Amino acid sequence: MAKKVQAYVKLQVAAGMANPSPPVGPALGQQGVNIMEFCKAFNAKTESIEKGLPIPVVITVYSDRSFTFVTKTPPAAVLLKKAAGIKSGSGKPNKDKVGTVTSAQVREIAETKAADMTGASIDDMMRSIEGTARSMGLVVEG
């Protein structure tokens, strides 16, 4: 018999740095999941990714308190900030520009995000990421 799904928990956890403190502890403790087991499994799965990069994760909790999880690619905004070398986006993106990214960097980010954005071509993903860049106050060159 298949396991019955009790809940889906969506979190953003820093790669290789999952620990029982918030937000992981309270979210999983509420569902009765073994928090340390998740932290060890998540850290092992994300050890090849740059430490500290926020990784979205969807945890499926079953009625017998077991779980599975799927990691996604980092948010486009985080990858854009890293590519542009900035700490944060602009508060007034239409007036204050805080940095620039090249089309090549946008394509690289689109190819990284391709695993999560199903059904879209690379060009469509590039347009989406360029829009995110503009809304952050970044100038897209090329």
UniProtKB/Swiss-Prot annotation:
It holds the Pfam family Ribosomal_L11. GO terms for cellular component: cytosolic large ribosomal subunit. SUPFAM superfamilies: Ribosomal L11/L12e N-terminal domain (SSF54747), Ribosomal protein L11, C-terminal domain (SSF46906). One of its GO terms (molecular function) is structural constituent of ribosome. One or more lysine residues are methylated. It comes from the Bacteria. Keywords: Methylation, Ribonucleoprotein, Ribosomal protein, RNA-binding, rRNA-binding. PROSITE patterns: RIBOSOMAL_L11 (PS00359). GO terms for biological process: translation. Belongs to the universal ribosomal protein uL11 family. Forms part of the ribosomal stalk which helps the ribosome interact with GTP-bound translation factors. Part of the ribosomal stalk of the 50S ribosomal subunit. Interacts with L10 and the large rRNA to form the base of the stalk. L10 forms an elongated spine to which L12 dimers bind in a sequential fashion forming a multimeric L10(L12)X complex. NCBIfam families: L11_bact. This is Large ribosomal subunit protein uL11. It comes from Yersinia enterocolitica serotype O:8 / biotype 1B (strain NCTC 13174 / 8081). The gene is rplK.
